[in-house]
Amino acid sequence: MSSDVSPPPLLSAEAAAQLATAPPVFTTEQILEILPHRYPFLLVDRVVEYQPGQRAVGLKNVTFNEPFFQGHFPNRPIMPGVLIVEAMAQIGGIVLTKLPDVAGRLALFAGIDGVRFRRPVLPGDQLLLSADLLTIRQRRIGKMFCRAQVGGQLVTEGELMFSLVD
């Protein structure tokens, strides 16, 4: 399966605000049924847009009580970039849930390409996470374009690769 999906344009602050208040497509409870991650590593609170096998958009409410803020950094809390990338990968895992070739398989992080960090994520921010499937090859390896935004501003974007295992 392959797709020639082009990443969508960056959402405006107004569009991001509309999605932030949209009813969930998947609640936290449903996300727990889809993803293997658990607290404190589950980084998607709800899914607000879902096109099976193509695209997903979700939210992560970043609070001061996040465990990573204790050490990153004690007097200036900033969400670690690697966890922003992990949150994007998790929303990418949700994109794959309804693909027939993927049922019962686990998507593992296989690489990142061209990921750039544009602004810090702070306590009180709401991350809007999106993932668009670009390709799946030989039903084993694939690539997604992922993006994180806060209030219509780009935080992080890039391509994430995954490997499917039984």
From Swiss-Prot:
Its EC number is 4.2.1.59. The active site is at 72. One of its GO terms (biological process) is fatty acid biosynthetic process. Keywords: Cytoplasm, Lipid A biosynthesis, Lipid biosynthesis, Lipid metabolism, Lyase. SUPFAM superfamilies: Thioesterase/thiol ester dehydrase-isomerase. Its main location: cytoplasm. It is an enzyme of class 4 (lyase). InterPro entries: FabA_FabZ, FabZ, HotDog_dom_sf. It is found in: Cytoplasm. Signal peptide: none annotated. It catalyses: a (3R)-hydroxyacyl-[ACP] = a (2E)-enoyl-[ACP] + H2O. One of its GO terms (cellular component) is membrane. GO terms for molecular function: (3R)-hydroxyacyl-[acyl-carrier-protein] dehydratase activity. Belongs to the thioester dehydratase family. FabZ subfamily. Involved in unsaturated fatty acids biosynthesis. Catalyzes the dehydration of short chain beta-hydroxyacyl-ACPs and long chain saturated and unsaturated beta-hydroxyacyl-ACPs. This is 3-hydroxyacyl-[acyl-carrier-protein] dehydratase FabZ. It comes from Synechococcus sp. (strain JA-2-3B'a(2-13)). The lineage of its organism: Bacteria, Bacillati, Cyanobacteriota, Cyanophyceae, Synechococcales. The gene is fabZ.
